[in-house]
Regions:
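S-adenosyl-L-methionine
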Residues: 1-18
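SAM cofactor-binding core of SAM-dependent methyltransferases
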Residues: 6, 18-81, 88, 92
Length: 92
C-alpha cells in the first residue's frame, strides 16, 4: 500500500529552520519526506535517513545527492551514529 504523507509541505517547512543544517528522516520508506527535505536544504545542509526495511534501504540507494546518506538500521540506534546536539531537526 502506498503511503501518502499528510501536511508534507507544512511539516518540512516547520522542520527546516536552517537550510545549512543537519537533518534526519527516521523512517525513509519511499523517500517522500527525504526528497522534499533535500529540495529545501542548501548544498551545505545534510540529510541522513534510517530504515530497517531492506526494500526501503535499497530504494534509498537511488538518491544520489552528495548531501545525503542512508542507514540500513532502526532509528532507535541514532546514538550509534550521531550526537543529537549536532542535529538541527528529526522527523519520524
Amino acid at each position: 500500500m502506498l503511503h501518502i504523507p499528510v501536511l508534507l509541505e507544512e511539516s518540512i517547512d516547520f522542520l527546516i529552520q536552517d537550510k545549512n543544517g543537519s537533518y534526519i528522516d527516521c523512517t525513509f520508506g519511499r523517500g517522500g519526506h527525504s526528497k522534499l527535505i533535500l529540495n529545501k536544504i542548501s548544498s551545505k545542509g545534510f540529510l541522513s535517513s534510517f530504515d530497517k526495511d531492506p526494500d526501503a534501504f535499497k530504494f534509498s540507494q537511488g538518491f544520489k545527492e552528495k548531501n545525503f546518506k542512508s542507514f540500513h538500521d532502526s532509528f532507535k540506534n541514532l546514538d550509534k551514529y550521531f550526537k543529537t546536539e549536532s542535529i538541527n531537526g528529526i522527523i519520524y
